[in-house]
C-alpha cells in the first residue's frame, strides 16, 4: 500500500472500528466488510463503476443502495455513503482489509494465508489452525485459502512475514540448491 493510500485507509478503518466498538457491532461489520470485499472481487464492473470519477456521486449512491439492499447494517451503509461523498470509495477494499486487520488485533487473532494444490477440507483447516496457534501467541486463527496447482503438493502457510513452505515445489527447490553446492 502506498503512503498516500495508507494515510487515507488507516483513519477510515480506525473510524469504522471506533463506530463498530461503540455500537457493539464489530462482528456484524466484519461480516459486511467481507461481503463487500467479495462483491468487489467478483464484480470488476462494480469496482470500476464506483471507482469512476466521471460518474456522479448520487448515481453511485443509488447503485450501492440498490445493490446492497438490507444486506448490510444501516450504519455500514451510511459509512459507504460517506466514502462516496468524500471521494474515497475507491479505497473501500483496502479500508475493509485494514478494518479486518484491526479486528484480528483486537481479538488476538492471526491470519494464516494457506496455499494448497486443492481446496482444503475442515479437518485439514483445523489441523493448520492448531499448528499455527502452537507457533504463535494467538487465541484464534483465521484461515484464508488459495488454490495453486503449481506448488505440486503440500501447503504454503504465510503468517505475517513468516512463511512455512512445505510444498513439493519448495522441497524440490531446496534439493536443487543442495545439489548445486556439492
Swiss-Prot record:
<keyword id="KW-0406">Ion transport</keyword>
<keyword id="KW-0472">Membrane</keyword>
<dbReference type="InterPro" id="IPR020781">
    <property type="entry name" value="ATPase_OSCP/d_CS"/>
</dbReference>
<protein>
    <recommendedName>
        <fullName>ATP synthase subunit delta</fullName>
    </recommendedName>
</protein>
<dbReference type="InterPro" id="IPR026015">
    <property type="entry name" value="ATP_synth_OSCP/delta_N_sf"/>
</dbReference>
<dbReference type="InterPro" id="IPR000711">
    <property type="entry name" value="ATPase_OSCP/dsu"/>
</dbReference>
<comment type="subunit">
    <text>F-type ATPases have 2 components, F(1) - the catalytic core - and F(0) - the membrane proton channel. F(1) has five subunits: alpha(3), beta(3), gamma(1), delta(1), epsilon(1). CF(0) has four main subunits: a(1), b(1), b'(1) and c(10-14). The alpha and beta chains form an alternating ring which encloses part of the gamma chain. F(1) is attached to F(0) by a central stalk formed by the gamma and epsilon chains, while a peripheral stalk is formed by the delta, b and b' chains.</text>
</comment>
<dbReference type="GO" id="GO:0031676">
    <property type="term" value="C:plasma membrane-derived thylakoid membrane"/>
</dbReference>
<dbReference type="GO" id="GO:0046933">
    <property type="term" value="F:proton-transporting ATP synthase activity, rotational mechanism"/>
</dbReference>
<comment type="function">
    <text>F(1)F(0) ATP synthase produces ATP from ADP in the presence of a proton or sodium gradient. F-type ATPases consist of two structural domains, F(1) containing the extramembraneous catalytic core and F(0) containing the membrane proton channel, linked together by a central stalk and a peripheral stalk. During catalysis, ATP synthesis in the catalytic domain of F(1) is coupled via a rotary mechanism of the central stalk subunits to proton translocation.</text>
</comment>
<dbReference type="Pfam" id="PF00213">
    <property type="entry name" value="OSCP"/>
</dbReference>
<keyword id="KW-0375">Hydrogen ion transport</keyword>
<keyword id="KW-0813">Transport</keyword>
<comment type="function">
    <text>This protein is part of the stalk that links CF(0) to CF(1). It either transmits conformational changes from CF(0) to CF(1) or is implicated in proton conduction.</text>
</comment>
<comment type="similarity">
    <text>Belongs to the ATPase delta chain family.</text>
</comment>
<keyword id="KW-0793">Thylakoid</keyword>
<dbReference type="GO" id="GO:0045259">
    <property type="term" value="C:proton-transporting ATP synthase complex"/>
</dbReference>
<keyword id="KW-0066">ATP synthesis</keyword>
<keyword id="KW-0139">CF(1)</keyword>
